[in-house]
Amino acid sequence: MQEIILSQEHKAWKHYLLAVKSKDNKNSDNLPDITVIKKEVTIDKAHLATYQSVCKFQKSDELSATYLHILAHTLFMELLTQKEFPFALLGMVHLKNTISYYQRVTSKDKLEIQVSFGEMGVHPKGKVVPIITRIYSKGKLVYEEVAENLKRVSSGESGEKVKARIEDDVLMGGS
């Protein structure tokens, strides 16, 4: 597994430039084993207050699940713009997020954020790219998220044929 440790001063702007680079290995069935890590993350209280105001959240020291999601965004971009990632970032479609918030987190906590890929899945319209975020406080997992994104891939088959093939694979236990 490759680990990429980000500094506190890491800036995201370069990722938006890298996102427009064209690369597309549509035949890839594997995602790279890379984890992007940011340690000793401290909360900027002015940023938190602005976020809470914009979202019409009550002012609080407690970090919402959505704020924790935002904290991980730079790491998402770092992961998705690695040269080993087989797909172009532009054109990917967000499908869903599944968030588990295990323990209250406040602006006083120092956090470690880790973002990595899960196992690539299939979808009637392409491939599902899961991005897993884990946030730790004092070494304990406090937040976990799986963001599923679709990489559209034309297989030459109609959507119904692909769906039927996937359902057959599931019923037969995979092949």
Regions found by a protein language model. Name each.
Residues 56, 104, 152:
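Residue-level marker of positions within ordered structural domains that often coincide
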